[in-house]
Regions:
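Short, small/polar-rich loop/turn modules that mediate ligand/substrate recognition or access, typified
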Residues: 177, 182, 239-241
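A glycine/serine/threonine-rich, flexible loop-to-helix segment
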Residues: 126-134, 178, 191-213, 253-255
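Rossmann-fold cofactor-recognition segment
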Residues: 42-56
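N-terminal Rossmann NAD(P)H-binding glycine-rich loop of SDR-like oxidoreductase domains
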Residues: 14-23
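Catalytic loop of short-chain dehydrogenase/reductase
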Residues: 79-80, 85, 108-178, 190-191
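Conserved SDR Rossmann-fold cofactor-binding beta-strand/turn motif
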Residues: 116-117, 182-194, 232, 245-247
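C-terminal helical subdomain
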Residues: 97, 156-158, 162-165, 185, ...
Length: 255
């Protein structure tokens, strides 16, 4: 069992990829605590209902989380069809806030996995902006930076997935050197989950048709969960700051 004896916190555990990671992590021996804004139907070792877009709610609710944590999977997310302010709060600012709040509870060797996306693949094109946002390290500072550097609704999902990849890389080095905590991200291509339809509305049929020609099919959530569980495990102990594509080859097809 790859995660025997580990305590893993998983956001977005009530649906899709987060739910599948929760199921597989328990199967691999972990004690799993789920977090979501929606109730869960899964068998978990604990569940905390919270809105990850509000730092005050996060601060109040994390008292219910364990004092000692071996892993965190940030799977909660919203598509770009919702308001860009909510995308910023849930997919980036709240994710960072929760992660930083839990770092002091993480044991040496702990692993954090952030779910980015193939849609964040253009991060090198806006690297300077993403580094500036990463340096605005708190929720409040990040929000202030975004107020002076507004992100368009049309590409907000892509923007904050790019920003997440860059923050993961920048912050992972400090976490590994200072606290022996590993942080990585994964970049799935399309996955059969309830938000897949939103991506079609978000990207438009033409882009979806173009990308569809590059892949055999969307992934099933368990095809994403396996690599995430690997990154949580000690087998991945020398993997730090990586952004792992799990996309059936789409990224390779862009070359
Ligand atoms: N499905 C895809 O094609 C795909 C592709 C690449 C990346 N992703 C990313 O994978 C992650 C998981 O998405 P999914 O496909 O499993 O979607 P999903 O909708 O099935 O699951 C997302 C979960 O996040 C929760 N959530 C959303 N907002 C929240 C909030 N404010 N507070 C607490 N919980 C909240 C939802 O309740 C839901 O349970 C997301 O970050 C998404 O951007 C998905």
């Amino acid at each position: 069992m790859k995660l025997h004896g580990k305590t893993i916190v998983i956001t977005g555990s009530s649906s899709g990829i987060g739910g599948e990671v929760a199921r597989l992590a328990r199967f691999e021996g972990a004690r799993v605590i789920g977090i979501d804004r929606n109730d869960t139907l899964l068998t978990l070792d604990g569940f905390v209902k919270m809105d990850l877009g509000d730092p005050a709610v996060i601060d109040a609710a994390i008292t219910a989380l364990p004092d000692r944590i071996d892993g965190l999977v940030n799977a909660a997310g919203v598509p770009g069809t919702v308001n860009s302010d909510i995308v910023a709060r849930v997919n980036y600012l709240g994710l960072r806030h929760l992660t930083e709040a839990l770092v002091p509870r993480m044991l040496k060797g702990a692993s954090i996995v952030n779910i980015a996306s193939i849609l964040g693949a253009d991060w090198p094109h806006r690297l300077d902006a993403h580094k500036e946002l990463a340096a605005a390290a708190s929720f409040v500072l990040g929000k202030a930076w975004l107020d002076t550097n507004p992100v368009q609704q049309e590409n907000c999902y892509q923007y904050f997935k790019e920003a997440l990849i860059v923050w993961t890389k920048k912050r992972s080095l400090e976490l590994f050197m200072q606290d022996n905590i590993r942080m990585n991200s994964v970049a799935p291509g399309p996955v059969f989950t309830p938000i897949l339809g939103d991506f079609v509305s978000m990207l438009g049929q033409e882009r979806v048709d173009r990308d569809s020609a590059l892949v055999k099919r969307p992934a099933l959530p368990d095809e994403i969960a396996g690599p995430i569980v690997f990154l949580l495990s000690d087998d991945a102990r020398w993997i730090v700051g990586a952004n792992l594509p799990i996309d059936g080859g789409i990224e390779a097809a862009y070359v």
